[in-house]
Amino acid sequence: MQIEIGELIQLSHLRWKYDTPGIPDELFERSEQVPITKEEVRALTISKLRLKEGFTVIDVGCGSGSLTVEICNQIRGGAAYAIDFDEMAVELTKLNLSRFGFKAEVILSDAQDVLPRLPNVNSIVVGGTWKNTRKIIEMGISKLQANGRLVINTILIESAYEALSTIYNANLEEVDVTQVIISKSRKVATGTLMLARNPVLIISATKPTS
């Protein structure tokens, strides 16, 4: 299934000229049917992943591809794998990678089917809504190299519980939970007001060396 260009917010081809994460949301191609990880959440997620040039990273539940683009901007010379079971999300991720001048292997699949075939990686991020959160996280942990970083973004308390219990059962280290509550300004006739966005939980951990 191809995304109709007319359904997207059309923007001219460009590249992000900075090393810092947090590319403005409006610079991405978007669709109302595919969620985008907001720029402030992306910036924090990238910091939790602890990326550097040459790393290999898996993005499970890539959605619009905004986080995949941010990852590619940090791991120049490395490799990125983006996975989603939604065909429109995969097409949108490819569009955003192209418009920012990055390359990644974008895979239309259920994560449980494709993760066993991917190489071991330095970092993995899991987002979106999956039917079997625990199994996907277990498989993700098995793909992490020693000292590899796992980051999970979720808006659901139930998913956070599943993630944390799985992480603790796997004896990961440096386990951290950060709740992100962002408010953005909006200009109104009488001044500027702040509009709150949905809280996001960012769970991060490190795979031990032994």
Task: Describe the function of each predicted region.
Residues 64-76:
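Conserved SAM-binding loop of SAM-dependent methyltransferases across substrates and taxa
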